[in-house]
Amino acid sequence: MNHKKIQRLWREEGLRVPQRRKRKRHGISTAPLAVTADGPDRVWAVDFQFDVTTDGRPIKIVSIIDEHTRECLGGMVERSITGEHLIDELDRVASQRGTYPTVLRCDNGPELACVAMADWASGQVGLHFIPPGEPWRNGYVESFNSRLRDECLNINSFWSLTQARVVISDWKHDYNHHRRHSSLGYQPPARYAATCTHR
């Protein structure tokens, strides 16, 4: 059989040649693989979540967690978030804390595996991209996101982006200042961070 006959048979049967899938972009890690958060601001973890307002429009939520203190350091609630938006938020958090993290742990999302993020991190922050399909390697922020989903997003319907920002911000404040963690000696993250001697 030649290729013309094969094409004719495919066409008669209404079949199509499968399109090649685009390969997922993978970030290039610049930090050592075995990174431990043995003090505040050593390792920050970043991850995204999605929700919708009642009109069906998407909400994108980014959270930045200090892996040692478990504090939610910052984040954004927007309709869309680019790598440049995330860089602005990371700069804001670093300015507020007076330092950048040694390592930023994240997945391979397009906002994180972009050229702008690599340029921003070069020389000042090590990037540690977890392997695709292994979210447990970013466990602290995944655990945080699970609580955010169960205790905030699943029990609230957001009428607007502004309402979502306020409700999520209030939840994050409560998480930082009132939620006790057994791994922190049953202290809330903010109190533990204020008394932490691991510098």
Predicted segments with their positions:
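Charged DNA-binding/catalytic regions of mobile-element recombinases
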Residues: 1-199
